[in-house]
């Protein structure tokens, strides 16, 4: 029920926006951290709706950071459409992004219709964090990292999009699972990250707008607005850092972190300082 939803105060909203911004594009799951961080501080769970709305700040950061890339992508696709050149790089990339968005839209609608929201129990978060860490580690080992962004097509987009649908499970991480899928397609790490960011644009927009409309409450506007603003600022810095990091390093630091994070949650549940 809407009446049971907790809305953060102004400084709590800024803190949660910071957590969202830092973790959204790192392969460590923003949803998981937005579930665990408040629990450690003794705050109630703000819920999936609040998390989805403040993701619009992360979306704004992506749009600004990749403004030049998006402009070239859209102009190139428009020219390809005019020429009916459907093998052109920009057209294939755009179609891959659009097709890759369909699985998470369909899965998200199904989850909403059947269960109302994805499971948010901490044991689910912990298991998903460790499970995706193992998958990402496997992708690091077997991925050949020989393809760039311009080699991607519609089939690649569908494959990564199917993986993205798993991000509805808290703890999986949208960026983590799409990065894993892209590495398994032999993409270079920085190219895989860029594709993950671009593929996330429609998903973040649709989820944020849908939840804002469905769960609209006037008393939530201040906390949502401050959380979104904070998420925007920290997301921009996170994007820039991750792109630079993956140009020179692997994802193993995130793999180790995810395993440690998952084990910490299980330990907290076992000792009682975290509640399911």
Curated annotation (Swiss-Prot):
Domain of life: Bacteria
UniProt KW Cell wall biogenesis/degradation keyword: yes
Membrane topology according to the record: Multi-pass membrane protein
Keyword Transport: no
Pfam families in the record: BacA (PF02673)
Recorded coiled-coil stretches: none
Top-rank EC class of the record's enzyme: hydrolase
EC number(s) stated in the UniProt entry for this protein: 3.6.1.27
Protein name: Undecaprenyl-diphosphatase
Taxonomic source organism: Synechococcus sp. (strain JA-3-3Ab)
Encoding gene, per UniProt annotation: uppP
């Amino acid at each position: 029920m809407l009446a049971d939803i907790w809305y953060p105060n102004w400084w709590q909203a800024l803190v949660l926006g910071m957590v969202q911004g830092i973790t959204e594009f790192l392969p460590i799951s923003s949803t998981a951290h937005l579930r665990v961080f408040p629990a450690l501080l003794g705050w109630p769970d703000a819920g999936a709706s609040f998390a989805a709305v403040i993701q619009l700040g992360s979306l704004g950061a992506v749009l600004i950071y990749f403004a030049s890339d998006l402009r070239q992508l859209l102009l190139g696709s428009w020219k390809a459409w005019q020429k009916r050149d459907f093998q052109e790089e920009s057209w294939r990339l755009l179609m891959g992004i659009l097709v890759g968005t369909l699985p998470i839209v369909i899965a998200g609608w199904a989850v909403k219709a059947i269960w109302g929201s994805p499971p948010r129990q901490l044991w689910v978060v912990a298991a998903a964090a460790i499970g995706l860490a193992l998958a990402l580690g496997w992708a690091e080992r077997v991925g050949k990292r020989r393809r760039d962004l311009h080699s991607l097509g519609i089939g690649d987009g569908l494959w990564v999009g199917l993986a993205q649908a798993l991000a509805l499970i808290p703890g999986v991480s949208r960026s983590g699972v799409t990065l894993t899928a892209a590495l398994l397609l032999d993409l270079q790490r920085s190219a895989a990250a860029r594709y993950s960011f671009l593929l996330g644009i429609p998903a973040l927009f649709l989820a944020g707008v849908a939840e804002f409309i469905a769960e609209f409450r006037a008393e939530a506007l201040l906390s949502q607005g401050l959380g979104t603003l904070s998420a925007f600022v920290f997301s921009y810095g996170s994007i820039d850092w991750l792109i630079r990091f993956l140009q020179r390093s692997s994802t193993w630091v995130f793999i180790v972190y995810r395993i440690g994070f998952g084990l910490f949650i299980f330990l907290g549940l076992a000792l009682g300082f975290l509640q399911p």
